[in-house]
UniProtKB/Swiss-Prot annotation:
Protein's organism: Phaseolus vulgaris (Kidney bean)
A cellular component term, taken from the record's GO annotations: cytoplasm
Assembly and interaction partners: EIF4F is a multi-subunit complex, the composition of which varies with external and internal environmental conditions. It is composed of at least EIF4A, EIF4E and EIF4G. EIF4E is also known to interact with other partners. In higher plants two isoforms of EIF4F have been identified, named isoform EIF4F and isoform EIF(iso)4F. Isoform EIF4F has subunits p220 and p26, whereas isoform EIF(iso)4F has subunits p82 and p28. (Microbial infection) Interacts with potyvirus viral genome-linked protein (VPg); this interaction is possible in susceptible hosts but impaired in resistant plants.
Name by which UniProt lists this protein: Eukaryotic translation initiation factor 4E-1
TM region positions: none
Amino acid sequence: MVVEDSQKSTITDEQNPSRVDNDDDDLEDGEILEDADDAASAASKPPSAFLRNPHPLENSWTFWFDNPSAKSKQAAWGSSIRPIYTFSTVEEFWSIYNNIHHPSKLGVGADFHCFKHKIEPKWEDPICANGGKWTMTFQRGKSDTSWLYTLLAMIGEQFDYGDEICGAVVNVRNRQDKISIWTKNASNEAAQMSIGKQWKEFLDYNEPIGFIFHEDAKKHERSAKNKYAI
């Protein structure tokens, strides 16, 4: 949402000022197309016309990457997650999005997150601790557009219960990609059902989706059952 307008305004792909081909095979998962040390400066230098009239978002957001090459069976869960970049304007978002690999280009095992600034994409984060997540599944390599539209709806504050949303994550796995939206208060059924229904509408997603409490996921892992479904 652009702060200057009291009504919700949609951020769309047509507003992307500099679409680029990010098919650089030499780019490592989770890295910016520029040198990693120059990522922040590269992303904060959109065309001068956009610098003159930035469009602030209602919230600042941080991209996080979980590098599969850094994972090991001995490592604590979440220990390899690292922040990539924080953005607070529409222009900064597009500068970053245009210079990172999209899900179809990430290696198997990679997790890419976009969470509200100062919320870590971990169950242990105090804001996430009592929450849960909605999850959609996609054929391997076919989640790019849905990931983008999820981000646009989320950072553009298109959800009626946007304050309930912590962030979103795309998980790249052998047989499928998964996109999840994490929320704060899993027991608030009205909020969770609203978020799930709107998300399906935004993406025109016709398959059933389920909501799992983080607490259940911690206890039962893959055998955790959906508490809500749409």
